[in-house]
Amino acid sequence: MLKFTPDHEWLRLDGAPDAGIATVGITPFAQKQLGDLVFVELPAVGTRFDKGAVAATVESVKAASDVYAPVGGEVVAVNDKLAAEPGLVNAEPTGGGWLFKLKVADAGEIDGMLDEKAYEALTAAEPG
């Protein structure tokens, strides 16, 4: 199940819920707003973030945009394919275009994220 932030990041818990590993990316809405991505700057494995901290940067022909950590945790993997193929984020924003994986520090932070219905209501109110 995907969860979302008002800043247009998504999070999906991987494997067993008690493992606490989550995959993070930007939403289809965000990639559409940005346009074709030309560069993705990912965090280093082992980096720790608090919820809301800048974790990555995506650059398109239109603009650069920060990607925020939807929850606190430690980066355990990054999507190395994006260095050569940043357009994967456009083509598969919630699939092959994922950005990084976190070991979640506090699973309770996930509960405060938006579900799909709430996120759709949020984006319906935004221009785009």
Language model features: what each stretch is:
Residues 1-54, 87, 91-128:
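Acidic, low-complexity mobile loops and tails
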Residues 60-63, 80:
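Short, conserved catalytic or interaction motifs in soluble domains
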